[in-house]
Amino acid sequence: MELKFNIYKDSWMDNGLENFFRILKNLNSCNIELTDTSIKLKIKNKENFIKELIKKIIHEKRQNLLIIEKDEKTGEIKEIKKDHLILQEEKKIGGKVTFKEDLYKPEKTPEIVSKIFELKKGKTRCILCGRAFDKAVKKLQQANYPFVTKIASLSGVRSYKDGRVLSLREYYDNLCPFCYLIGILEWTDDALIYRTFPGDKSFLFLPYFANLRELHDFKKSCIYFGILNNTARYSNICVYPNTNDVENTPGEYSTLLCFYEKFIANATDDVIANNWAILQIPFGAVKNVKIDFINVKEGVLGTIREVYKNGQNFNYIYKELFNKIYFFSENKNTIDWEQTRDIQENLSKAFLLDDFRDFTNCLLPRKGGYVFFSSEVRQALEELIFIWRWRRMGIPKEKLDAIKSVGNIIAKISRNNASLLYKMDKVRAVEEFWSVLREIARKIPGMDEKDLKMIKPTALDELIQLVKDVVKKEKDGWKEVRDLLVVYSSMYYAIDKMPKGGGNQ
């Protein structure tokens, strides 16, 4: 028996196809070949093949759906279904999870697998792969294809293809048995990242490649280098490779950035994913799955690599920089952890999406408090800014001194009223930019004598000349300078607010 499964150009099904390849790869009863656009399966002995596949599903793959935990009150060891799974369960029997899905019921698995491989040609065309078949095993539903929603007003598949949204009505009858199997088994994939926030939602990260071999190479590296711990319930990114401790990232983008750091540190030269479909799966009975499609530019990945390999003050952008930036509440006179985690998440998002404008906004002082960090973190932030933004403009590092000095001036003027700092942030045209610089110049003579000793007034002239030079090369280059000014102003504002703040610039 010979079968061919072509690439779907669909993030869920292509990851499922790659997972299916890894499941079958070590079975003795078949030969399987992976190409750029398909997998080719040759079954040598159908009876033995079905037995081997059943054993693989029951004794190995099913375990990837579960967490084993000890009940703190009774001491009983029990199974718990992973929170991100869109698989319904029945009442536990003896502390063991019982899935409603027959494929994952050990007593029903043989029957389902046998039915799937009894496929005969028919008049029905599969909605996902186009294969002609005679009889479905299951309808298209969230358990085998999570992009279908149960909410009637929002029904349809949330997927993008060739720039268009393709919508399917829910519960299609024409799903072929093979697509059902590939889709339902994808939940067992041990090469996917997940992050759960109890009682709220889970994120499931699906890498996307147009080439199945590249997808396989990437996921194989994730497994081989021990980056993921799939026995953990809420997060599966290991703090250190092949250990049980996992990262406690604050959100979607910080999780992805944290993963990239682990991958680059352990699989430096291997194939890496730029494109992701990230499923946001809510808690509760009705699950309207949202999807973010993310493309991480090569330049951003290059910055992560550069920092890891050659960083002078730090080697990890999330772990050693964003994760050590906090929000201090002046009202509470302590760290506001909710705001802190929001800022860490938003910094990660702005960086991964290469959005320096949003990045600078994260560092602005807010009502009732300000963003702060240690001198070591400040040095790391300056190095990141140079690698990520300044160097690509082809301007020497020493030219940053003028921006830093003017940022210090803005911070001193804004100490008791941050309106000037906000005004700089809101500048939208170069004429407004010059106007704010003139306002800064007018305010310098009225500064406290102590502050005057701690600033460099001539830095304004240096900055003006720098901006003129930048604009000659790139018309909108002044915007990058504006954003850098906001970063340094926010930085020195926080330093001044903290004990023993400020410094000669």
What is the role of each PLM region?
Residues 24, 57, 113-120, 129, ...:
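Hydrophobic, Leu/Ile/Phe/Ala-enriched alpha-helical segments that form helix-helix packing faces
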Residues 1-124, 135-137, 331, 345-346, ...:
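N-terminal alpha-helical interaction blocks
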Residues 77-231:
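Basic, glycine-/proline-tolerant helical and adjacent loop/strand elements
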Residues 178-182, 349, 383-384, 485-491:
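Extended low-polarity, hydrophobic cluster-rich segments
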Residues 3-7, 30-34, 39-43, 65-68, ...:
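Hydrophobic transmembrane signal anchors and adjacent membrane-proximal interface regions, especially
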Residues 220-475, 481:
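Intrinsically disordered, low-complexity regulatory regions
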